[in-house]
Every structure is written in C-alpha cells, then in structure tokens.
Amino acid sequence: MVNIQTNTSYIFPQTQSTVLPDPSKFFSSNLLSSPLPTNSFFQNFVLKNGDQQEYIHPYLIKSSNSSLSLSYPSRQASSAVIFQVFNPDLTISAPQGPKQGPPGKHLISSYSDLSVTLDFPSSNLSFFLVRGSPYLTVSVTQPTPLSITTIHSILSFSSNDSNTKYTFQFNNGQTWLLYATSPIKLNHTLSEITSNAFSGIIRIALLPDSDSKHEAVLDKYSSCYPVSGKAVFREPFCVEYNWEKKDSGDLLLLAHPLHVQLLRNGDNDVKILEDLKYKSIDGDLVGVVGDSWVLKTDPLFVTWHSIKGIKEESHDEIVSALSKDVESLDSSSITTTESYFYGKLIARAARLVLIAEELNYPDVIPKVRNFLKETIEPWLEGTFSGNGFLHDEKWGGIITQKGSTDAGGDFGFGIYNDHHYHLGYFIYGIAVLTKLDPAWGRKYKPQAYSIVQDFLNLDTKLNSNYTRLRCFDPYVLHSWAGGLTEFTDGRNQESTSEAVSAYYSAALMGLAYGDAPLVALGSTLTALEIEGTKMWWHVKEGGTLYEKEFTQENRVMGVLWSNKRDTGLWFAPAEWKECRLGIQLLPLAPISEAIFSNVDFVKELVEWTLPALDREGGVGEGWKGFVYALEGVYDNESALQKIRNLKGFDGGNSLTNLLWWIHSRSDE
C-alpha cells in the first residue's frame, strides 16, 4: 500500500503554540527534526517529568531517577471499573559513582510502531521496550555495576553453573528469570540484587504462575531479542509485523486475543504457544514464535449509501423530512466556532445529500451543496472568523487557532486530543462535496489531503509535516484519542464510532478523488477499528474477557484506557446509559451497520439501555434517537413510532437520517 497522494504537501499557516510541551526534553536531538508521535503507547515517557508509568504488554513500566521499574500488574475489578495496579516488582539501575554527577533523565533514542528504546546515558543502560515481549531487554553498553531492587522479599535465589541464568522467587508468589549474554556475578540481600561491572545484554522475564513447565520455553527463546518492530500495510485488510532482532534462535513474543483471531486468517509461518499465558487487561496474552506476523481481517467495502437500499414505500416519509431539514440549513445562523461541533454540522448536511441521492430526489441537492461550500471553504482558506486550522511545527500537525492558546479549547485539539474525531467530520463533508463537484474537489485537494494526512500519514520521509498514523495504534489495533496529556492509565479513547467514521470518511475521500491507496488504507483501518471495538468496547452477556461483576452490569464501555476500563464518560456518569450507547454509535451512517452487525448483541445493548430513558430529570432527545436507531435493527416498527415522536436531534443527526436508517434495515 503506497502512501497516499504524496505529491501534495500543503500545510496550513504556521503558528507557535503557547500550550504545547517541549519535546526536546526527552527525544534525542536526531529525532527532533521529524514529526513526533502525540498519541502513542509511550507518550507518558515524554510528558512533564517523564516518570508516569506506561503499559507495554505484559508489563507496566515506569522510568524515574535514572532507574526503570517493572511491574507484572495485579488487577482490581468492580462493576464500574477495571484497572491494573502498578507495584515496582523490579527496579533496575546503575548506582551513580561520585564522578558521574547527578542521575540523568532518560532519552528516547528510537521508536517505532511496536517498540521504544529508552536510554539512560549517565548509567550506560539502554532498554529495548518491545510491545508483547515477555522479556525486558537491557543493553549495558560499558562495564557497569547493576542494582535490581524489589519491594518484595527475596525468598530464593539460584543460578546455573555458568552464571548466565538466575532464578529468584519473591514472597508475593512471583518467580523471575534473568538471562545474561556472558557470565554475571550477582549477590543479593533481602530486597536488592547487585552485580560486579558487567557489559552485554540482560533479559528478565516473569515466569507465569511460577510454573516450571513454562521455564523451558522461556529458556529456549531467551537468546534472540527484538530491538524494534514495524507494522507494514502492504495490501488491503492486512497488517504485517516485522521485527528487527539480534542474536541467534527464534523470536518469542506475546499476542492478545484479537491478534490470535487475525493471525488465524493470515498466511503465517508462526507457531502459537497457547499454553504460555500472561495476564493482561486486554485478555490473556499467548506466546507466538516467528520473525513476522501477518494479521488479516475480513474485507469491508465502504459505500456512500445504505447497503440494502431504502424500502420504496417509505420514500415519501423520508422526502418530507428531507425537504424540511434542507429548508432549515443556513450557514449564517451557525453560532458555534468549535471545530468539533462545526464539523458535526458539516457532516450532518453531507448526510442529507447522500440520502437525497439514494432517494433519487435531486431537488434539494443544490441548496445543500451551497451550504457545504459556505461552511467548509472558510476553514480551508483560513478566513473563518473565530477559529481555523494552523500548523504546529514543534510536534508536526494541525492545531486550531483556539487550541493554540488554550489547552482545553476545542476539546484539547491544540494538544492533539481527538484529531481523528474532529477532522473526520470535515473529511466526510469534503468527500461528499468532491463527489458532487469534482472541480471544487480539485481546487481544494491540497488542503483536503493535508487534513487527512494529519492522522493518516504512513511515511514521514515522504511527508515530513505529520507524524505516522497519529491516532491508530497498530499493536492494539484501535485508535487512541488522548493526546499530549499525562495520564496515570496511559492513552484513552471514548468514542469508537467516531474513530471508525474518520477512517471511513478517508476511504470515501479516496473514492471521490479516485485514489485507490487512500481507499485501501481508510478501509483497512476502518475494518481493524471495528474489530477492536467489538473485542474491547462491546461487552456481551456471558463474555469472559472481563470480570463477571463488570460483565453482568455493562453492555458497552465508557472510556477505554491503556491500563483501565471505565464505565464513566468524559461528559456523563456511567448511569447515563443512553449516552454510553450513543457515543459508540454516532455519527449514524452506512458504516454503522458494520459496527453493529451482531443483532443479538444489539438487542442486549438496547434492552440494557432502555430503562435509563425513564430517568428522573429527563433524557436528551438527541440521545434517545440513537437508542431507537439501534432498536430499529431488530424491532423496526417500534423504533419508527418512537423516532416519529422525537422533539429534537443530536447536532450531527436529523430526522431524515434516522428515518433513512430505519427504512433501510432489512426485514430478514
């Protein structure tokens, strides 16, 4: 899959943000000339003091004071939240001699989709943090004495004859294995292990369940270590992991449940070790032996219109609503200047055009086309009053005028929150307008591609204005919305449906411009995001991924974090179930059918939500509309009557869109 339309390198006007952090504190100087990740799995390592933990499967890892702490986390669960608990099971450092000066902070010397390398220059330590590695790998670059401390008590401590493997057991039941590329002499007290000066590679792994049957496996694969890994999008609906490895033997890594599902679809020369299991908040991780993985998802074909078509007898009802919705369009009456809400209004109007096309009712199209031009062009031309798109060179990306001086402005867009959400709505409008008016599309193509590349750039060498795949995480196979904010539980994402919509909209833009690589990339990420949504956000009755008390009480996630599962929303409490359903459905579009293809689950979700609509104090009509839309998947007539009685709609939705949805459901 070649990078998308690399001949366009338009950037919006440059600005100097007053709220963005300085990346030079933690990235090595050779990385600073390239765009930098803003929503990545290691983001906490480059924010504030860089000392907040990150979850790098299967360990929580924390860097502070020239030491690196490793935790194989325990887990706490209730009906409201699940989270992994950080306890520094092992802390690795090189004691500072008086001549070395004070301890230094870590530096990131390299990073990739699947790895990050943390250097401690003052200690001669370099950690290869590779996602899914059961081993923590550290390179000691010059002869250096080491210290490994624990908050537990060391109950037993032994080595092999050559002093290249050590086994230690703690009083919390954990057993850890340490491997060295050359003999190392270790001594220990109750809670500290020390070495003489050593240089070479050390690998440390938890022995799962302290079960000796796994020890032979970890021994066998201990010599071959990965230093980096990249996800390659070579063909549609496929992502390939390739690792750079060193030393002899085969490479052992760990796969989460979605990996295993997609590995079985691919043409793989890998061996899955189902008995080797590590616990994870994303489900059990199992061993996989192989230098590269091929993950394949089922093909998903994006469409402008509904998949099965609108029932003929319902055309008149939809046309009546459509005429009224189009009649009320007036760009001069829009009061919001926020990029998110403005984008939703654009996408709402674009839906009206596509529904008119599907109904073969062209009368309303000219008015909607003019509305789209009047609302989109000022953002592309930089003439919008009160806000606009600007370019930040420090990290490499689009920020808004509001966001350049206010970290909370535009929901944190200026610190790289929610980029795929906001920009996805604009891209949807641009795609539809380009479909209607190809000449308009050609005129604004540079700006359109600049917007899409902000979160869909595959190659920073071909387009150095934007980081690689800003929001989509190729290891967990879904996106992160949280940007440059330090969070104890890492990155997070609330609305999966808006993430899906962003990639879907990009694929539609590819269709509008005749850009096959963009169609392929957008469709592939759409399909993967949907797989991730179904795996981790949709909580099915009787599911075993999460604890029983959580699964019994919930049918859909609130906010999903790298290290936590939360039922609450950013904007509403967990009890507002209609909001939890709605934020995982909006914006309602043809792709919604693929997200909610499991009718049995849809029924479970709606029946779980419906009692909340009788809540004292009332429920917003806009949220009710989304609940009724999903009810229409299995009870069309009941949902239709409820939708006809609605008195209001979400800002990105309309009566026309809800009627289109209900009347395009299959009777099967």
Swiss-Prot record:
Q: Where is the active site?
A: D418, E494, E498
List the glycosylation sites: N65, N124, N160, N187, N465
Q: Where does (1,3-beta-D-glucosyl)n bind?
A: H422, E494, E498
The alphabetized UniProt keywords are: Carbohydrate metabolism, Cell wall, Cell wall biogenesis/degradation, Glycoprotein, Glycosidase, Hydrolase, Polysaccharide degradation, Secreted
Give the Gene Ontology MF terms in alphabetical order. endo-1,3(4)-beta-glucanase activity; glucan endo-1,3-beta-D-glucosidase activity; polysaccharide binding
- Tissue note: Expressed in roots (at protein level). Expressed in leaves.
Which residues constitute the signal peptide according to the record? none
Q: Region labeled alpha/beta subdomain — which residues?
A: 209-299
Q: Name one GO biological process term.
A: cell wall polysaccharide catabolic process
Q: Which PANTHER family match?
A: ENDO-1,3(4)-BETA-GLUCANASE 1 (PTHR31983), GLUCAN ENDO-1,3-BETA-D-GLUCOSIDASE (PTHR31983:SF22)
Please state which protein family the record places this protein in: Belongs to the glycosyl hydrolase 81 family.
Q: What is this protein called?
A: Glucan endo-1,3-beta-D-glucosidase
State the species of origin.
Glycine max
Its ancestry begins with:
Eukaryota, Viridiplantae, Streptophyta, Embryophyta, Tracheophyta
Underlying gene: GBP
